[in-house]
UniProtKB/Swiss-Prot annotation:
Catalyzes the pyruvoyl-dependent decarboxylation of aspartate to produce beta-alanine. One of its GO terms (molecular function) is aspartate 1-decarboxylase activity. One of its GO terms (biological process) is alanine biosynthetic process. The lineage of its organism: Bacteria, Thermotogati, Thermotogota, Thermotogae, Thermotogales. Belongs to the PanD family. It catalyses: L-aspartate + H(+) = beta-alanine + CO2. Heterooctamer of four alpha and four beta subunits. This is Aspartate 1-decarboxylase. SUPFAM superfamilies: ADC-like (SSF50692). CDD domains: Asp_decarbox.
Length: 120
């Protein structure tokens, strides 16, 4: 039986910008996407640590090395520039193949502080 499990997470990223009039999505620095094993147009759950809001959206790539985290569309009304967010991607796994999520921990400058492979 397959189960939906946490695949990867970018923990405590800082929102650098938001655009209500853009068609939707979360823009993420391509370097972070590569390190986290996330892909453009992948479905993600985003949790705002500052206000508790959660929303589902999809990823669009931002320039590699830009350190940008940009919330677009209607979800931009749920966050403020400078808020810290947790970005979570999920996958479907057989219980015997799941090894745990990859976790990217960020600092306040959107620099990677630690990369962990959590075990189950």
């Amino acid at each position: 039986m397959q189960e939906i499990m946490l695949k990867s997470k970018i923990h405590m990223a800082k929102v650098t910008d938001k655009s209500i009039n853009y068609m939707g999505s979360i823009g993420i620095d391509t370097e972070l996407l590569e390190k986290a094993g996330m892909k453009p147009y992948e479905l993600v759950l985003v949790a705002d640590v500052n206000n508790g809001q959660r929303f589902v959206t999809y990823i669009i790539p931002e320039e590699k090395g830009s350190k940008k985290i940009v919330i677009n569309g209607a979800a931009a009304r749920l966050v403020e520039q400078g808020d810290r967010v947790i970005i979570m991607a999920f996958g479907m796994y057989d219980s015997n193949e799941y090894k745990g999520p990859k976790v990217i921990i960020m600092n306040e400058k959107n620099e990677i502080v630690e990369i962990k492979q959590e075990g189950v």
